[in-house]
Amino acid sequence: MSVEEKVLELIRPDDKDRERLEKVAEEVLSRLKGFDAQIQGSFRKGTWLKGDTDIDIFVFYPKEVGKEYLREKSLKELIQLFQDLNYEIAFAEHPYLILKINNVEVDVVPALKIDSGEDVITAADRTPFHTKFVTTHLDEKGKDEVRLLKQFMKGIGVYGAEIKVKGFSGYVAELLTIYYGNFRKVLESAKTWKPPIKLNLVEPKRDFDEPLQIPDPVDPKRNTASAVSLRNIAVFSLASKIFIERPSIEFFFPTEIKAEEIIGDILLIKVEFKEKSVEDIIWGQVWKNVEKLKNAIKTAGFSLIDIGAWGNSQTVKIAVQIEDKNISRYYLNQGPYFYVNGVDNFMRKNKYVWVGEDGRLYSLKKRRETNLEKIVLNNLSFKENFSVEMTWLSEINQDDKELHKFLRKRPTWMQT
């Protein structure tokens, strides 16, 4: 039995799985009588994975009611229908409901009914056209090929188009399978990818500038892969190359290996948000803060090894790994050659100045700050109310899986 066959046995849902989700979907749809309510997403397309316990139900309104109706009145209508259930309000382009029924998560999403994927008023409006395109281009074998690709992406950590992950969406996995034909062919091509990667199921109706470009077959002005970061493209390409050479179930279900040592000095920053917020909004700010911290730490004179972030919309951890937290108060500042314009300015601005053997002027400059905690506090900012707790890592929390990944660096699938 091949690796793919073994994996399919683990990820292909059976009749019992399907019946369980169908029962929940029927309960929700029964409350939406009188509305144009439809099951959408991977469950409808037949590309969902065993163990996935979420269903997308879209409630379509006439496009004439407009976006404002979805933002205000539709939510009130839906809450009234489901107020006796365990629900929460979530936000994307407009609010929607998340229901929890028998350990199944149901997203009830209002959208506008449009004539084609190019007539979108909100991003959710395209969904039925995506569903139709995928279901008309994939047979049952093709759906299994998508399942393999999704699980492979999950296993190597590049699955999910949300801002936190910046990876491949389920729809992109489906389009890749349709474009190349099957899971193996996707990987065979991906191992040789070099940005910009242009995969045209349809001709694009505008130019894209992202590293991976897959125009949406239902709206060719849109790049379906715009969310995928260069890092995740690199990880997927490298993992594809290694899998083709040495197939292993490790790519799909990686072994959790504990980190054994702390290399360098690591400052662990724990950010707690006082109010609940939208995860995409939080993580958009997290990554901006990470970039800001990178620049500030390097500018301050620390040798930065790595910086990583993990968590959710309530608690975020940022790990800063540097070679040494103790740096000198002064540093060598290289100036111009003696015959270059700017010598006078350099001498005027610096106190400890001398001429080097190479004919350049040099000076000693005092660092503005040598305390990394203060640098972090001065550069960390969020729109939400938050608190910060910082500790220098002296021992490894055995329960923090993401910390172990950060410390270990090398993923388990990266065989030599």
Curated annotation (Swiss-Prot):
Keyword Cell membrane: no
The UniProt record lists the keyword ATP-binding: yes
Keywords recorded for this protein, A-Z: ATP-binding, Magnesium, Metal-binding, Nucleotide-binding, Nucleotidyltransferase, RNA repair, RNA-binding, Transferase, tRNA processing
Catalyzed reactions: a tRNA precursor + 2 CTP + ATP = a tRNA with a 3' CCA end + 3 diphosphate; a tRNA with a 3' CCA end + 2 CTP + ATP = a tRNA with a 3' CCACCA end + 3 diphosphate
Origin superkingdom: Archaea
Known cofactor(s): Mg(2+)
Gene Ontology molecular function, alphabetical: ATP binding; CCA tRNA nucleotidyltransferase activity; magnesium ion binding; tRNA binding
Residues where Mg(2+) binds: D54, D56, D107
The EC number(s) this enzyme carries: 2.7.7.72
GO biological process terms, semicolon-separated: RNA repair; tRNA 3'-terminal CCA addition
Positions bound to ATP: S42, K45, H130, K150, Y159
Residues that hold CTP according to the record: S42, K45, H130, K150, Y159
A family per Pfam: NTP_transf_2
Function recorded in the entry: Catalyzes the addition and repair of the essential 3'-terminal CCA sequence in tRNAs without using a nucleic acid template. Adds these three nucleotides in the order of C, C, and A to the tRNA nucleotide-73, using CTP and ATP as substrates and producing inorganic pyrophosphate. tRNA 3'-terminal CCA addition is required both for tRNA processing and repair. Also involved in tRNA surveillance by mediating tandem CCA addition to generate a CCACCA at the 3' terminus of unstable tRNAs. While stable tRNAs receive only 3'-terminal CCA, unstable tRNAs are marked with CCACCA and rapidly degraded.
Assembly and oligomerization: Homodimer.
Extra remark: A single active site specifically recognizes both ATP and CTP and is responsible for their addition.
Membership in a protein family: Belongs to the tRNA nucleotidyltransferase/poly(A) polymerase family. Archaeal CCA-adding enzyme subfamily.
Protein name, per record: CCA-adding enzyme
Natural source organism: Sulfolobus acidocaldarius (strain ATCC 33909 / DSM 639 / JCM 8929 / NBRC 15157 / NCIMB 11770)
Primary gene name: cca
